[in-house]
Curated annotation (Swiss-Prot):
It comes from Sulfurovum sp. (strain NBC37-1). NAD-binding protein involved in the addition of a carboxymethylaminomethyl (cmnm) group at the wobble position (U34) of certain tRNAs, forming tRNA-cmnm(5)s(2)U34. Homodimer. Heterotetramer of two MnmE and two MnmG subunits. Keywords: Cytoplasm, FAD, Flavoprotein, NAD, tRNA processing. This is tRNA uridine 5-carboxymethylaminomethyl modification enzyme MnmG. The gene is mnmG. Its main location: cytoplasm. Belongs to the MnmG family.
Length: 623
């Protein structure tokens, strides 16, 4: 059976990869261990969060499915950091995990050019360093010139609960053992990581009346740019905030010797920013309590996910520690928490397209690349699917820059720096985060979605109208000035805006004050024609215009720098400030330009700047 692209794994990365490829007109096959588990969320019942919300918005702006599915199945919507600047705000939604899975499975099974096979892939067909297809345990051979592996935690997955171990990719599901061994045989650098999840509690056994209530936002902010805000009003459920206490800590600490992560049973490195409860108690012994979030898993509110209590402690300890929390003294555990170890591919083995350097046509995306999180997985899956399809079509790859998208930051970090622990996205990882806001993801990326054919005509028309209105308004604010007449100063005083002393550009008037829609319209009534979405963009762009200009200048300078040629006789070991590792890599690769040097794994922007300075000094004869 012949295909153009084969995707192995039906999780968040595999869904976006297979949908993107198929929607671009490429014949695609998705191989998954259990068809009913397509779109299953292995851990928390939520999408988004700080920086993660940016990724979901970017996936959506490019034509991915995650944002639409979240809006269709969400049971609580919030904007995190709402009181802070727009660059660090993050959208987050609680999802109905059952409905999310059903939605995604239905979309996948009803997409043209996309077939689904419930099988276990056990190897690849590789000839002369080029992938030709996939083999399965049932003896089937599926041929394709592009294969995308999105195996999540299933590669050599090993679950730990106390001293008990079980080979599995997720609780109750087979691990992918043969494929993991096959990848090692290809010479790929394979490592071992660990993650975990918490116990799920029978909701009727929890007393939420003694906990802090955490409601959703009103009105609820949708994720997708394609969702109609005027009609978006889903039923929202509250989450609850509870706390561990000294008794909880005593129970956990007295059982450290039974914890797989302390006994030496677990070898893989766990996520730094999502530690298990036993790790938190061990690392932060001076803290009297830790915050936990009690989150509904479905709209039926039958089970609660205890966010903040990920654990692999034995089941008797899990029950005792859960019942020590106020409001949970009668808690009944439906599913026990566990840790899982799994294989991952060193992401420095990859190109920026997510194609492996050693095997032509083989791509990897998601947790297999060392990341953690549904959102990071979806972003990689989308880009792998897009680039595999573009390669089939003989077109140029789509590589998003660091100044263009958080997706660009994510992939660039992975393929140039690599990772020894599960990688999570943060806004602090982006150098140009004022340009990479959630609210302007469509302005940044929907042009690519349009070119790729991943966005429908109705959305494109709406997007282009929005883009036109924003440009029109900003051009007016940049090109027109106002003088400090008595009448105008009175208007500024009336709305509490900063007064001006000289003839001032409108964009600077807004940039100096805390403007909202009403204040701006009181000064410029003609702006009342813009809807709230457009007005929001106008206000942010105006307020931060000078900072945005500065960041854009830095980006332009970087682009110019990367064009600079490196002299053939340039000696890297004479450059002070470069590590031995970077020197070795540069000497081996012998790049001809700074851009070529930037593509080398481990060569940082700081290293490029140092080399640039030395090139300029050598040209001036100063060294």
């Amino acid at each position: 059976m012949n295909y153009d692209v084969i995707v192995i794994g039906g999780g968040h990365a595999g869904i976006e990869a297979s949908l993107a490829s198929a929607r671009m007109g490429v014949k695609t096959l998705l191989i998954t261990i259990l068809a009913e588990q397509i779109g299953a969320s292995s851990c928390n019942p939520a999408i988004g969060g700080l920086a993660k919300g940016h990724l979901v918005r970017e996936v959506d702006a490019l034509g991915g499915e995650m944002g639409l599915c979240t809006d269709a199945t969400g049971i609580q919507f919030r904007t995190l950091n709402a009181s802070k600047g727009p660059a660090v705000r993050g959208s987050r939604a609680q999802i109905d995990m059952d409905e999310y899975r059903i939605y995604m499975r239905n979309v996948v099974l009803n997409t043209e050019n996309l077939d689904v096979k419930q099988e276990i892939a056990d190897g690849l067909i590789v000839e002369e360093g080029e992938v030709k297809g996939v083999t399965t345990q049932l003896g089937n051979r599926y041929t394709a010139s592009k294969v995308i592996i999105t195996a999540g935690t299933f590669l050599n997955g090993l679950i730990h609960i106390g001293d008990k171990k079980q080979t599995a990719g997720r609780q109750g599901e087979f691990a992918s053992v043969e494929l993991a061994e096959y990848l090692k045989g290809l010479g790929l650098n394979i490592g071992r990581l660990k993650t975990g999840t918490c116990a799920r509690i029978d909701a009727k056994s929890v007393d939420t009346s003694v906990m802090e209530v955490q409601p959703g936002d009103t009105p609820p902010p949708p994720f997708s740019f394609r969702t109609d805000k005027s009609t978006f009003n889903p039923k929202q459920l509250p989450c609850y905030v509870a706390y561990t206490n000294e008794r909880t800590h005593e129970i956990i600490e007295s059982n450290f010797y039974r914890a797989p992560m302390f006994s030496g049973q677990i070898e893989g490195v766990g996520p730094r920013y999502c530690p298990s409860i036993e790790d938190k108690i061990n690392r932060f012994r001076d803290r009297p309590r830790h915050q936990i979030f009690v989150e509904p898993q479905t709209i039926d509110e039958t089970e609660y996910y205890i966010n903040g209590m990920s654990t692999s402690l034995p089941i008797d300890v899990q029950l005792e520690m859960v019942r020590s929390v106020e409001g949970m003294k009668n808690a009944k555990i439906v599913r026990y928490g566990y840790a899982i170890e799994y294989d991952y591919v060193d992401p420095t083995e990859l190109k920026h397209t997510l194609e492996t350097k050693k095997i032509k046509g083989l791509y990897t995306a998601g947790q297999i690349n060392g990341t953690t999180g549904y959102e990071e997985a979806a972003a990689q899956g989308l880009m792998a699917g897009i680039n595999a399809a573009l390669s089939i079509q003989g077109k140029e790859a789509l590589i998003l820059r660091r100044d263009e998208a958080y997706i660009g930051v994510l992939i660039d970090d992975l393929v140039t720096k690599g990772t020894k622990e599960p990688y999570r996205m943060f806004t602090s990882r982006a150098e140009y985060r004022l340009l990479l806001r959630e609210d302007n993801a469509d302005m940044r990326l929907s042009k690519y979605g349009k070119e790729l054919g991943l966005l429908d005509d109705a959305y494109i028309a709406k997007f282009e109208e929005k883009q036109k209105n924003i440009e029109e308004a900003l051009n007016y604010l940049q090109e027109n000035y106002v003088t400090p007449t008595k009448e105008f100063l009175a208007k500024l005083e009336a709305i509490g805006a900063v007064k001006i002393n000289d003839r001032t550009c409108w964009i600077d008037v807004i940039g100096r004050g805390d403007f909202n829609r009403d204040k701006l319209v009181s000064l410029l009534p003609e702006f009342d024609k813009y809807d709230d979405e457009v007005m929001g963009q106008i206000l942010v762009e105006a307020k931060y215009s000078r900072y945005i200009e500065k960041q854009q200048m830095q980006i332009d300078q970087m682009k110019d720098m990367l064009k600079i040629k490196i002299p053939e006789d340039f000696t890297y070991k004479n450059v002070s400030g470069l590590s031995n590792e970077i020197v070795e890599k540069l000497e081996k690769a012998n790049p001809t330009t700074l851009f070529a040097a930037s593509e080398i794994s481990g060569v940082t922007p700081a290293a490029l700047e140092i080399i640039h300075v030395y090139i300029k000094m050598s040209q001036k004869g100063k060294i």
